[in-house]
Amino acid sequence: MFIDSVKLTLSSGHGGAGAVSFRREKHVILGGPDGGDGGDGGDVYFVCDNNTHTLANYKGKRAMRASDGEAGMGRRMTGKKGESLELIVPPGTAVYDAQTNELLCDMVEEGQRTLFLKGGKGGLGNFHFKNSINQAPEYAQNGMPEESIEVRLELKLIADVGLVGFPNVGKSTLISAVSNAKPQIANYEFTTLTPKLGLVEVDQFSGFVMADIPGIIEGASDGRGLGVQFLKHIERNKILLFMIDSANYRSMSEQFSVLKEEVAKFSSVLASRDYAIAITRVDAAENLDENISEFMKSINLEPNQVGKFVYKQDLYSFDAKKPYFILPISSATNENIDELKFALLELLKKEL
C-alpha cells in the first residue's frame, strides 16, 4: 500500500534515576556511598533507506518512543542506556512539526541518519554527592525527562522528470513504454491513484527517473480531485514534462493553460522549473497539424521545425519561460519516443 503522509507522536527515552547505595562488604565498617548513575534515555533517529518506498510502516501508529534508561546500581554501576528508536523512511521524506508546520528535517540521501530527539540524561548516583560535611548522602538525582513532539511525515518522490497532465492523457502509457514501471492502464480517468517511478534507460551509459502522478484537474491546487496530496510529488522533480492530449475534448491551449495555472498556484518555485511539452495520442487525433498550429499561436511561439520536433530551443540561448521543445508522440505506436528520451536527457544535463 502506498502511504505518503502520516502523523504520530515521537518520544525519546526518560533518563534512569541515580542510585542511593552504600558499600557493603565484610570487614568494611561504614562503607561510603557507591550509588551509580542512571542510564541515558534512548534517542530517536530518522534513517533514509532506498529500499523503502512508502510510509506504510507507520500508518495507524499514534505514538512511538525510545526505551527509558535503567536506574543506576550499587558498586557505582551505571544503568543501561535506553534502546534508541530508528524510523526507516524513503528518500524524499520531510518531517514537519504537526502544530506549527515547521520543517524539522529533510531526508533525501541514502544512508542519511539524523538525530531527531535526544534521550533524557541519566541522574547522578549518591556517590557524586559525598563531601567533607556529608559523608553518607542519602539522595541521588532523578533522570531527566524525555523529549516529545507530534510530527507529520510527508513523502515527496524524488525524480528527474515529472509528468504533468489531465487524467487519461497517456502518462501511464508513456512511463510503461519508456521505463521498467508497470502502472495500471485503462481507458478511464484516474486510473493512476498513486504515484509511480520508472527508470528510463536512454543508452548504455545514461538514464533518468520519471515520475507519473495522478491526473491534475482544474482546482487541484485547492484540493479538487486528488489535489494537493499528489501535486507535492513533483515538487522535487528537476524538470516537468507537460502532457497535452491531441485527442481530448479540451483544446490543447485550454489543457496547457489550466495545468500551468494549477502548478503555479501550488508552488511558484515549481512553476519556474524548466519544462517541455509532449503532444500525446497523435495516432488518434484529427486535424493534428491545424490544432498544433493553433496551440502554438495561443502560447506565442513560432514553429521552428527541428527534425520531428515542431518546436525546439537551442540550449546555448535557452529561454526558461518557454518550453525546451514541443514534440508530438504516440506511446501506443512508439512514434517519436526515442526522440523524447534523448531530448529530456539533454535538458537534464543542462541542469547539472
Curated annotation (Swiss-Prot):
Task: Name the family.
Answer: Belongs to the TRAFAC class OBG-HflX-like GTPase superfamily. OBG GTPase family.
**What's the domain of life for this entry?**
Bacteria
Please list the residues that bind Mg(2+).
S172, T192
NCBIfam families noted in UniProt: Obg_CgtA, PRK12297.1, PRK12299.1
PROSITE patterns with a match to the protein in the record = G_OBG, GTP1_OBG, OBG
The organism encoding this protein is Campylobacter concisus (strain 13826)
GO-annotated molecular function: GTP binding; GTPase activity; magnesium ion binding
The segment(s) forming the Obg domain are: 1-158
**Official protein name in the record:** GTPase Obg
Record-listed E.C. numbers: 3.6.5.-
Q: Which Gene3D superfamilies match?
A: GTP1/OBG domain, P-loop containing nucleotide triphosphate hydrolases
GO cellular component entries:
cytoplasm
Annotated transmembrane regions: none
At which positions is GTP bound?
Answer: 165-172, 190-194, 212-215, 280-283, 330-332
> OBG-type G domain: from which residue to which, for each copy?
159-349
| Gene Ontology biological process | ribosome biogenesis
Cofactors needed by this protein, per the record, are: Mg(2+)
Compartment(s) of residence: Cytoplasm
Lineage, highest ranks first: Bacteria, Pseudomonadati, Campylobacterota, Epsilonproteobacteria, Campylobacterales
- Gene name, per UniProt, is obg
**Could you give the subunit structure recorded for this chain?**
Monomer.
What is this protein for, i.e. what is its function? An essential GTPase which binds GTP, GDP and possibly (p)ppGpp with moderate affinity, with high nucleotide exchange rates and a fairly low GTP hydrolysis rate. Plays a role in control of the cell cycle, stress response, ribosome biogenesis and in those bacteria that undergo differentiation, in morphogenesis control.
Pfam families the UniProt entry points to: GTP1_OBG, MMR_HSR1
Q: Which key words tag this protein in UniProt?
A: Cytoplasm, GTP-binding, Hydrolase, Magnesium, Metal-binding, Nucleotide-binding
